[in-house]
Amino acid sequence: MLLAVDIGNSTISTGLFGLDGELRFLASLDTDYRKTADQICVDLMNLFQLYHFRYEDVTDSILCSVVPPLNFMMEKALTRLLGKPPVVVGPGVKTGLNIRLAVQSQVGADIVADAVSALEQFTAPIITIDMGTATTIGVISEGRTYEGGLLLPGVNVSLEALSRRAAQLPAI
């Protein structure tokens, strides 16, 4: 089985995939910069227990992160729990995605993962939208080519800013 971990600014999403590629469980944890590798291991073990799976059956893991301060601890936790390090999405990882930008290394791991996932499910051209703490919009053309995209404040960030800066707009 494959354990996929996506560290976002607000939540850490984890998904367990069977050998057939089917999603077995999807769970979320709070993104907490203070957690140690041991605490992350306990959190992950609890998720496996909650969903009635054995972490010992996981053969591989992959890590995607937009929170660099947590990468080391998560890599350490996954290595300790599963007995080998995760594949970390980032520059140098072969995804089959052609990035048509001047500085390819500036494309976030989350954007690469969104694009690759979309290409596995749909035929290009594709527009991806990921609505998290930040909203990202990506454009993928024929030939598995990432053309570029937009990075915008997420819905909650926008609502918080509006309620703070606009006198007659209350927080909702």
Can you say where each PLM-predicted feature lies in the sequence?
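Short glycine-aspartate micro-motif
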Residues: 2-6, 62, 126-130
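Short glycine-rich, Thr/Ser-proximal phosphate-binding strand/loop in the N-terminal lobe
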Residues: 2-44, 143-166
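Glycine-rich phosphate-binding loops at beta-strand->alpha-helix junctions
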Residues: 11, 35, 64-71
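Phosphate/pyrophosphate-binding loops at sites that engage ATP/ADP/AMP, CoA/4′-phosphopantetheine
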Residues: 44-60
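Short glycine-rich phosphate-binding loop at a beta-alpha junction
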Residues: 55-66, 85-87
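N-terminal/domain-start alpha-helical segments
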Residues: 68-73, 77-80
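Catalytic phosphate-donor-binding core of small-molecule kinases
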Residues: 168-172
